[in-house]
């Protein structure tokens, strides 16, 4: 009786991979592919796109920065 039970387990184990493992491998593969694609696009953008322009400073902020540096502001 015990030989029948172990033979049944051997057939089930030899059947194939665990479905949970397959799902895990597929999700892991997609995640790795996504990360590699993001890195490749990032490197491409660094080489080919111009640098971002800074936002223009308002006149108040410009005056404040110049006063901090000790540069006389024109018009005052």
Curated annotation (Swiss-Prot):
GO terms for biological process: regulation of DNA-templated transcription. It holds the Pfam family S1FA. It is found in: Nucleus. The keyword Nucleus applies. GO terms for molecular function: DNA binding. One of its GO terms (cellular component) is nucleus. Coiled coil: none annotated. Residues 51-76 are annotated as: Disordered. Its main location: nucleus. Keywords: DNA-binding, Nucleus, Repressor, Transcription, Transcription regulation. A motif (Nuclear localization signal) lies at residues 50-55. It comes from the Eukaryota. Residues 51-66 have a biased composition (Basic residues). InterPro entries: S1FA_DNA-bd. DNA-binding protein that specifically recognizes a negative element (S1F) within the RPS1 promoter. Belongs to the S1FA transcription factor family. This is DNA-binding protein S1FA2. The gene is S1FA2.
